[in-house]
Amino acid sequence: MSQDSVTFADVAVNFTKEEWTLLDPAQRNLYRDVMLENSRNLAFIDWATPCKTKDATPQPDILPKRTFPEANRVCLTSISSQHSTLREDWRCPKTEEPHRQGVNNVKPPAVAPEKDESPVSICEDHEMRNHSKPTCRLVPSQGDSIRQCILTRDSSIFKYNPVLNDSQKTHENNEDDGVLGWNIQWVPCGRKTELKSSTWTGSQNTVHHIRDEIDTGANRHQRNPFGKAFREDGSLRAHNTHGREKMYDFTQCENTSRNNSIHAMQMQLYTAETNKKDCQTGATSANAPNSGSHKSHCTGEKTHKCPECGRAFFYQSFLMRHMKIHTGEKPYECGKCGKAFRYSLHLNKHLRKHVVQKKPYECEECGKVIRESSKYTHIRSHTGEKPYKCKTCGKDFAKSSGLKKHLKTHKDEKPCE
């Protein structure tokens, strides 16, 4: 039993304008690539008029001159001038009917019946003016392609053997809307497939890439960190934000930070967590002299107590600083005015007054010596002037700090429920 030939109507997919608007860009690109693929392959094996003998059955054209309704047309790249340009270069001397040469300089095929069939529908006396290379083979795709075909050439006889899957033979055209019911297999994002690319092998051991399994939705460009895949390299570059998203890498605890401050904070947390683990496991602390104080801090026990008042501290240094209160020791003395202080911090704060206030202001009313910057604020205390007024309740204040403190009371007020 002979196999039926494949026409373009068997593999074409048509969308209405309404259906086309429902497709996303990825689906539109997939549709365009599949239709261009089918048109190229069918134009490759197409011929104008099949070679006829007295017993041969005329075969229909694979690419019929079909006109689609205006409502079902979809704007695609024109392929007729690129992939279907054929010319009458071949003639059979018995029938004197022209044969057109397909793309890539491959001679037009004729449909061959099975071995036990008769009559033979192949013209055996092809005398071609142009001789192609002796061997041409189209390797079929291993994925879900629309059709699989093997085109062979032996001397001057051409054979075309279409091979269709069972599921592919059940596709029927819906006459109501002019749309071919066709199931597209979508591959999930980041999932690997076993689909391979089809290739065209020439006689000079050259391999030309034909397709990348675009009819199954397989993505060629994949981004490993999150498993997200993209069909086009440009989409991958636009998506390539993982490298610049977080610049600072915290390698010890495998966290990432956006700036140095967070990085330093993570370092402190990591160190504290490590020290806590050392205390629980009994490991020796890196700071041996303070290992006892560190252990008491982790356990919450204050081991250093003041003999005078009984106050306890975590660290011995805190206890030594506290003891100065009981002894009355003030070792830090100002060299300009002779005033003594218990802590160096207080002395440094006192020295700023001598440096900044070279010419202090003395109030004429009360004789108080104040800084020049606080002169006008002090004068308002004598005049009673209150230039700062609350817009909510109308209360006046002599200092801006008093107004700011008052405004917080309005923010804390809750409306009546």
Curated annotation (Swiss-Prot):
Residues 281-293 have a biased composition (Polar residues). Keywords: DNA-binding, Metal-binding, Nucleus, Repeat, Transcription, Transcription regulation, Zinc, Zinc-finger. Coiled coil: none annotated. GO terms for molecular function: DNA-binding transcription factor activity, RNA polymerase II-specific; identical protein binding; RNA polymerase II cis-regulatory region sequence-specific DNA binding; zinc ion binding. CDD domains: KRAB_A-box (cd07765). Transmembrane segments: none annotated. May be involved in transcriptional regulation. This is Zinc finger protein 114.
